[in-house]
Amino acid sequence: MSDAALYDLREPISVLALKHRFPTIAYVPEFTDAGALMSYGPPRLAMYHRTAEYVKKILTGAKPADLPVQQPTQAELSTNLRTARALGITIPDAVLARAERVIE
C-alpha cells in the first residue's frame, strides 16, 4: 500500500486485512502500529527536507523542469510480530535484525 490517501484508513485496512489473513506491507511505520505486517520506505522527515530544498530552489528562481528527479537514499523497515503471529508467519531473525522498529 503506497498511496497517501490511504493513510487515514490505515487502521480499518489493517483490521480487515488481518481478518481475511492477508499480510500487508505499507510505506510508513504508522501502518505497522495499526496492525500491518511490515512497512518499508524512506524516512518521511528526509522526504520533507528534500521537498523543502526543492521549494527553496524554485522560489529562488530555479525552473522546476531543470531540477533532477531524486531517489531516496535510505529506507526504514518496521515489522509487527503480533500480526506475524496472528497470520502464522515467521519473520527471519536476519529481517528482524535489519528492522529499525519491531512491535512485539
Show the residue positions of the predicted features.
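Short hydrophobic alpha-helices and adjacent helix-cap/hinge residues
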Residues: 1-104
